[in-house]
Amino acid sequence: MAEEKRIISVFFVILQSLIYTVFAMDERLDKVKVQCDYLPLINFAIQQNGASIIHQLSIENTTPAPLKDIQVQITTEPTFGNAAPIAVAQIPPNESICLSSFNLTLSANYFTQLTERLSGNLKIEITSEAESVFCQTYPIDILAYDQWGGLNVLPEMLAAFITPNHTAIVPIIKRAASILGQWTDNPSLDEYQSRTPDRVRKQMAAIYTAITEQQIIYSTIPASFEEYGQRVRLADSVMAQKLGTCLDMALLYASCLEAIGLNALIIITQGRSEERRV
């Protein structure tokens, strides 16, 4: 089917991501000014998708002499990642350099075991000819493995919570095929192969009906969840607990749609979520 004719399930408008920009100067040393642009939070989804925590690091030499043999070391507190030092040959007097590539490796094992939100730090140390010229910590929130960060920071990471290969949705898919067979005499979940919009709509409706039969109870969302995010129940938790917020249910529906080959798009609207189709 031509791309423009595809039917996409739309649940939730993704807003611009927030990046912290922090200007700092170590008053004890008074040799460099540093501007650090970084994400104010991190979670397992960000780690798995390889998103960069530090977007840019600008270092200005405020002295009348060049700074030579510079080493930039980034560490984390607690130890959720590690990075090799960055070497800079020199910064001329009263000039600056901008770094945008950081070999910061995040630990998948650390994030998968994190069940509660923590407060942490990024620590940046700069030396010139083995002499310290800057040392500063930058606060960062470390989210639980099943926690979405909200709209302010990489909202597109919500897509990481769509799990079309989860075994918990298999009963829903099977039931949807049965419902589709009752409606059309053809139980095949054949995504866009029919090249018929009505067939696609019926598959979507069958999935929706199968989910409603699960008798999942609505659970209210936290206040201001669009900005600050929330814990997400994945498909197995929704099915086992028979509880779900509007976000949990939207992710479950999107997971089922993707499992049968239909394209799903998640959008966030202000206030409670609602289903839309385009």
Predicted regions and their residues:
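Intrinsically disordered, low-complexity Pro/Gly/Ser/Thr-rich segments with frequent PxxP/GP/PP motifs
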Residues: T75-T115
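Secondary-structure boundary elements
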Residues: A168-A240
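Terminal connector regions
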Residues: S100, L104-N152
